[in-house]
Structures are given as structure tokens and as C-alpha cells.
Amino acid sequence: MAENRRKSENIRRANRVIQTRTFVLMLVLGVAVFLVLALKLYQLQIKQHDYYQSKALDQQTRSTVVTASRGTIYDRNGNELAVSATAETVFLSPKELAEELEKPETKWTKESLSAGLSQLLGVTQESILEQMERTYSQYEVVKLRVDEDTANAVRELLNDNEVHGVYLETDAKRYYPYGSLAAHVIGFVGTDNTGLYGLEAQYEEELQGQTGLVVSAKDNGGNALPYEYEQYYASHNGDDLVLTLDTNVQYYLEKYVKEMADQFEAANGATGIVMDVKTGGVLGMVSYPNYDLNNYSEVSDARLKAAIEDGSASLADQQLRQWRNKALNDTYEPGSTFKILTLSAALEEGVVDMSSTFECSGSITVMGQTIHCSNTSGHGHQTLKEATGNSCNPAFINCGLGLGTDTFYEYMRSFGLLEGSGIDLAGEATGIFMAQSDFSQLDLACYAFGQNFNVTPISLIAAQAACINGGYLYQPHVVEQIRDSSGAVVYQHDNTPLRQVVSQQTSATARECLEYVVSDGGGRNGQVKGYRIGGKTGTADKVKTGDV
């Protein structure tokens, strides 16, 4: 009896062990399964959330971009220099086309549709077929910004063949009404309507605007649901630029710069700037050779084209040459035009005045080096005005030596030559100067009449303007105002001068000397009846470079 009870107890104990182990095993398996499911859910809902959300939205919605109109660029008088004309972009949805091809009633094939689009759009049939194969995509651009006639022909092709999956959307094409006028200032946009050069690139953020979006719902068959299911995100047109440029000034500046460049066979081109000396606003800026903004990739200058044809230069190199704005991208020796600054600094420091006289024998020796005047026989006895009119090198060397190396160098800094003008155009080069610690008396003598250093034309004209406008240095600029699409002014250029470099009296005396250059000196051909004209002739020794 006792033996039976012991056996029964052992059996129960064994059963409890088995039950416990089974429970533990089930628990472990349950936890493991739960962890696997939790991990999978984490992967699906957290790590791959964006992916699956995108796929779901892709199945349920269709998005159409609403293009923003790029801002207009105006000259100071309201003339349109760059505008956005309406155009249309042709795109296809490979996914939708693939679904259409599965329907028995479809009238077209990949080959027939791609051939038709290729013929109308001038795009290879192979590239269109490649786009059609990308069935994971809903948006493949076939041709950007086609004209109205082409767009209508595409619509006719789609309607005749009942094609669903190829669409046209309104876009904007950049157009430059004046062609090549002010090309190097305005610049141009690329095929994606993004600014690449000039103001188009410098003010890309302001001009481009913000695209909008129409999100429409689709049913399980891929068909669009009624408009009440749409969400519309409005586009915002770009801001407009109002420039300081005057198209009349620009036209004549381009005309005469080209004439001079051709007359003197300037192989490397020429540049010219007209500036309002009281504000620093650029009224005209020319870089020659020029190009057509509406066809910016075509090299139009005969000499540049000849170099491409004879193999001495590549198309890309010549394109870069014609796009280069020599007024601010390149540096030159200023030659005698720099004497305006030497004159103003010497007057301001009391080194010379209108009673000063100079003797010119045709040369001067500094630190054992003989420096010649342009008139090698000498100008003889001269007043300050006469020395300016004669552009006498020894006279201006004496002005520079009277200032001393440190004072002269500080005037170059004060005139803004050492750090660049800060004009609101990209790519301004910096001048090339001897370090102040190495600046000797001989260097000073050469600098005083504009030799042995380089400046950009824009920096030089800003400094020259300070000599005659009462002594104030202004920052050169080409954008006077920015307006939003409603016409409200969102930016107005501040015409406060950066600093005063010389006094009103010094500036008045400098103007008198420069007027003498035109009335009685070497610049007589610059006279204009009825106007007070001042000027300064100047030629650096490096004419062999082919620049004007």
C-alpha cells in the first residue's frame, strides 16, 4: 500500500516537472515569437516607415508640381531685361503607362508612342524607351520647356491615341528681350531654370520663387478622384530686381567699346564701366566680346570661333572666355589713370597744392633706377594742372615720394583697392600688390604713376569716383531694389558711403585738374559741348597683352 503511494507520488512529481518544463519551453517560445514579431513591426513601422508610407502615398495619390514664375529683372527705367515666358514641359509616368499597356483596349504600343514623341520633341526614341522602362517611377521628364506649337502637337498625338500617362505641365522659359545687352551683368539660367552666371546666379534665391504642389487622390484603379479630394499648396513667384543700369547708357557704352576694341585689335577684348559717382550705382558695364543671352552656349565672336575651327582652343574654353566679365573678373595695370589717386592723396596730405611746380627733364632716378617720362625729351617747367594734363611721370613720382611708402600704402587701403570693391556680382578678383613690409621707394615711384601692380576695373573706378565726388568711397552695386510679386519693396540699397577718403576741397581741386586734362591736356577729344567734362588718359606698358 505504502509502495503504491510512493509510486503515485513519484509519477505526480514527474508530471509536475514535465509540466513546468513544458510551461518554461512554451514561455520561451512565446517570448521568442513575440520578439521576432516586435522586431519585424519595429522594422516595418519605425525603420521602414518612410519607405512604406511613400509606397502607400504613391499608390493613393498623384502629385503635380505648380511652377513658380521666376522674378523679372528691370533696368532703372522699368525696361524688362529678363522675363519668364510661359512654356510647357512634357513628362511621362512609366508606372501608369505600364498599367495602360495591360489593358486590351489600349491603341498604342511603346514603340509607336516613343516614335511619335521622338519626332515631335527632337529627343531620341531610345532615351524615351529607357524612361518607359522605369516602372518604379511616376515622373520622367521627356523635354523641358517646349513652345506652344510643339505642345499642341503633343496633345494631338496623345488625344488621337487616347494615351494616359504622358502629360504636359505649365513651366516658364527665361527670355532676354534685349539679347546681348548687358549680358555679363544679367547672366543666364540653365535648362533647369536655375541661375548659372551674373545676377541670375548671384540672386538665385530671390529670383527663383517657391514651387507649389497639387496632390490628387486616386482610386484602386489608378483613376483620379474628384477635386474635393485634392490638396493645393500654392506656389510663390520670385522677387523682381530693379537695377541701376540704364539701357541707353549700356547700349552706347557697348557700341563704343566694341569700336575701340576692333580699331586697336584688342585680341583679348575690352571692358568699360559708367558709374554714378554720388551713389556707386553702375549705369553701364561692358565686357567685350559679347554674347546672346538667349543662346548663351553659341560662341558669336569671329576670333573666338576661328580659334575653335583651327583647333587652337576648345568650345568650352571659348564659351568661358565670352562669359567672363572683364570688369571684375580680371585685373590690369591701371597705368596713368591711377594718377588721379596719387594726385588726390598728395593734395590731401599737403604734399602739393595748386601753386606747386615741377621740372621734367624726361626721366627721374630713384634708388639708382632711371624711370622715363612718356615725353622722353621732357615737359620742362609745369604747374600741377599742366603736369596732370601732360600726364608727367616724374611729377607724379615726386608726389608719391612726398607721401612716403606708409602713407601712400594706407591711401591705397582707404580707397578700397586692397580688399576689392564688394560689388553685388559673383567672381570679383582681388588686386595684386606688393606686401607693405616689402614696399620700397622704388616700388612707390612705380606705383605713383600706375605701374607694377594690378587692380580690377570696378575697384579702380570706385576709387576714382571718391576723388571727384567730394571724397566719399561708395560700394559699387547693380541692384538698387528688390520687389516681391505684389510690388512691395523688400530690399532697398543703402547709398550711405563707406567712408570719406579725402576732403571736399581736395576733391574740388582734383576735379579742376581733370577738367584741364580735357580742355587743354591730352584728353581734348573727350570734350562735349555744354558739359563739364573731366578725364585722365592712361596707357600701361603692357599693351602687348591685347587688352584695352
Where does each model-flagged region fall?
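Periplasmic/cell-envelope proteins involved in peptidoglycan metabolism and beta-lactam response
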Residues: 1-302, 331, 406-414, 526-529, ...
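Beta-lactam-recognizing serine transpeptidase/beta-lactamase-like catalytic domain environment
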Residues: 5-6, 82, 88, 219-232, ...
